């Protein structure tokens, strides 16, 4: 089983990734993947897509047909278009309701697996030391702060370890991002210098 130190660290990595990528992006990606599965919802999505193409095609045919010169043909196309449009709107409402239900399920699962797990770990392991500090290395007031609120003195509490992990992950992400931007700007500048020299 994963140690408490690593469990808290990976929970904070997951929280950081969700916050960085964005919950909406993750929800959309999961919805697309869900529609690839053989479910009734994916069948409804395919049917909605087919109806949309049919409505667009009938609308195009209606626009290309003169309502005065070819009224019978235009009226027949209009009836088909209206029927297809009603079916499309009904299917769209059904699919929207299914997507709303799916989004709520994903949001609940995402919260439970990230912030919910973090809160659970904080309460469940509130009296458990994450790790012990070497004796005599820190003054007693520092040991008290590191064990705050309920861990034994001379150890690091779950709450403090949560803060350390969140801060360390954010700082490391900033460092990696700035390094990547520096590398990108350095690799782009020789190419632009070479182009400028060729132009002269």
Swiss-Prot record:
Q: What is this protein called?
A: Protein get1
Which Pfam family name is an example for this entry?
CHD5
Q: Which organism is it from?
A: Neosartorya fischeri (strain ATCC 1020 / DSM 3700 / CBS 544.65 / FGSC A1164 / JCM 1740 / NRRL 181 / WB 181)
Main subcellular localization, coarse class? endoplasmic reticulum
Instruction: Please provide, alphabetically and separated by semicolons, the GO molecular function terms listed in this UniProt record.
Output: protein-membrane adaptor activity
GO cellular component terms, alphabetically, are:
endoplasmic reticulum membrane; GET complex
Topology relative to the lipid bilayer, per the entry, is: Multi-pass membrane protein
Segments on the Cytoplasmic face: 25-110, 173-200
What is the stated purpose of this protein? Required for the post-translational delivery of tail-anchored (TA) proteins to the endoplasmic reticulum. Acts as a membrane receptor for soluble get3, which recognizes and selectively binds the transmembrane domain of TA proteins in the cytosol.
Q: Hey, which stretches end up on the Lumenal side?
A: 1-4, 132-155
């Amino acid at each position: 089983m994963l140690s408490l130190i690593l469990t808290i660290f990976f929970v904070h990595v997951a929280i950081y990734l969700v916050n960085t990528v964005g919950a909406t992006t993750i929800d959309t990606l999961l919805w697309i993947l869900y529609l690839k599965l053989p479910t009734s919802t994916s069948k409804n999505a395919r049917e909605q897509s087919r109806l949309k193409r049919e409505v667009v095609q009938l609308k195009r045919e209606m626009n290309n047909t003169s309502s005065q010169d070819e009224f019978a043909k235009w009226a027949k196309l209009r009836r088909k278009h209206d029927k297809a449009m009603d079916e499309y709107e009904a299917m769209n409402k059904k699919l929207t309701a299914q997507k709303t239900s799916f989004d709520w399920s994903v949001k609940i699962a995402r919260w439970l697996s990230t912030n919910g797990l973090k809160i659970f770990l904080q309460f469940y392991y509130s009296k458990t030391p994450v790790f012990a500090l070497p004796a005599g290395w820190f003054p007693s007031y520092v040991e008290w702060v590191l064990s705050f609120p309920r861990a034994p003195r001379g150890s690091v509490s779950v709450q403090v370890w949560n803060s350390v992990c969140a801060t360390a992950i954010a700082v490391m992400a900033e460092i990696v991002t700035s390094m990547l931007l520096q590398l990108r700007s350095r690799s782009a500048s020789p190419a632009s210098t070479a182009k400028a020299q060729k132009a002269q």
